[in-house]
Amino acid sequence: MTGKSGQCWDHRASVAGPAGAAGPRVARLAGMRITVLAGGVGAARFLRGLRSAAPDAEVTVVGNTGDDISLFGLHVSPDLDTVMYTLGGGIDEEQGWGRDGDTYTVLAELSAYGAGPDWFGLGDRDIATHLHRTSMLGDGLPLSAATGVLCRRWQPGVRLLPMSDDRVETQVILRDEGGRTVHFQEWWVRLHAAVPAAGFVFAGADDAAPAPGVLEAIDQADLVLFPPSNPIVSIGTILAVPGIAEAVQMKTVVGVSPIIGGAPVRGMADKCLAAVGADASAVGVGAHYGAALLDGWLVDERDKAAVDAPELAGIAVRAIPLYMTDLPAATAIARAALDLAQELNA
């Protein structure tokens, strides 16, 4: 199977037998080209597992930049940085974001001046990244080139690309009296998603172009993976950039559910799904993507009823343990995704 064929909503769902032993599997993975559409923490931890499961594969990560925000004149790219720090060994493991061992002297000094916003935690080490990125952007480098420069230090072991060099901003339409629209970070970090969302707008997406290398990475991929990222404001934002969803539809795609037992592992995927009228379940997320995008779908063992769910007709569903409690667990999940892809491609 080489992806969806015919019209964009057609899908071939034939599934071959189980993959062979570990040795042949590893041999087949050598030189395999994998493209991953990634959000932040969940994607970064999955990518560590993927790197472990397929150390010789060529992995390109297309990162969500809809969360990017300007703070104190600095261009902050939360999801790109989370992937870069995690794979480069500099992440705050407890938080899942930000730099390890960071301090907040600069933020405290800004607060003493009464300068805001004070609701977004920028650590001192993290600020160095944003200063360097902002300086490069000011010198005329596109975000993709600036990301490449930052990755020279961190050596993440993957090619990390922003979804676009153009400005795309995820905005949240609040379900309040005024129907206000706020930046996603303000809704999530400042408001803690306490005000229900009525919907989401990917401002600028219609006029954006995929960053250099993005469409090529998808077109040349043997496999596209959707990690357990937010399907609406992470993967959904990436797919909103013209040309990306169409390219993905032509490939074999395996996704990992971010919902276990009816609740997100972390984050607010349930609130986002509710805002667009989708069910916060493994079945609901799989159906949201649909057979036009997904060929295979991994759900947790407690959601094994999804394997035969009629809403997921045309998608090969497998139930496995999905909690990424440590690197071995993340590796097992990534390996299961690769095994399912090999079944689909047999």
Features from the language model and the residues they span:
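N-terminal glycine-/serine-/threonine-rich phosphate-binding loop
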Residues: 25-98, 190-221, 329, 334, ...
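Short internal beta-strands
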Residues: 60-64, 253-259, 296-301
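C-terminal functional extensions of proteins
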Residues: 266-346
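Redox- and metal-dependent alpha/beta enzyme cores, enriched for Fe-S-associated oxidoreductases
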Residues: 236-276
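Electropositive, gly/pro-rich neighborhoods at or near active sites that engage anionic ligands
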Residues: 63-202
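Internal active-site segments that recognize and position negatively charged phosphoryl groups
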Residues: 156-158, 171-246
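Short, conserved loop/helix-junction motifs that constitute active-site signature segments
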Residues: 52-57, 245-251, 290-293
